[in-house]
Amino acid sequence: MRWGFERKGGGLVINARSETAAEKQLFRESAQLRRCLIPASCYFEWERRADGKVKYAIRPRGKELLYLGGLYTKPEPGALPRFTILTRKAADGISFIHDRMPVIVPKEKEPDWLSQQLTLDELLEAAEADMEFHEAK
């Protein structure tokens, strides 16, 4: 898989707002039929300050492995599928770093997400929100 849905006018869309993905032409079909989980140990976000940017490593509290909710494309013959990461409003404890965060699927909801048993709204309600973070280099 390759990261980023290809935009018709060029460029890549690496993130999709979970609140509107099912309505957007670029993501609609994938939101219904092609869901994926992207494994990670954390994700990184940069806080903008007057004196520059500060990089943070962020993950659910007490977890060493997390799965980001994603969507993927049906590839053309000979091409690799492409994926995008779903995002949501940032959890309260990290919103000072950035106003958005990836949708992190709880372990017990992973099968439901992959089998289309969860709607995007249900996934948002179940998504991990108790986050821990530290400055990263």
Kindly give the residue locations of the regions a language model identified:
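Short linear sequence motif anchored by a di-proline
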Residues: 1-137
